[in-house]
Amino acid sequence: PRNLQGATAAIDSAGMCRFVAFAVLDQPETCQALNDLLNAFYGWTHTGDDVTALGKRVLKMEREFNAKAGFTKEQDRLPRFFSADKVRPHDITFQVTDAELDQVFNW
């Protein structure tokens, strides 16, 4: 999930609709085609690793902005229903602790 979020942040910050992320990230050749498109449009010479790094930088900047705006990690939590309401047909809940969530962005 965190790699998907980073890749989606990179795609979104490059001016592409974030919904293309799902199609692009499922196929290596499509991902390469998008990278080629962005390189051609912006005059970049980015590799796939550069795009990954861009996504990480964007997410880091977003989190820094939120911290400066006064948001704390206690406010960066999923709604209670994620861990309380069972999802059918498997009757399971989201079983990730707050401590694990706090580590998601520690690259």
Per-region residue spans from a language model:
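Extended C-terminal regions of large enzymes
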Residues: P1-W107
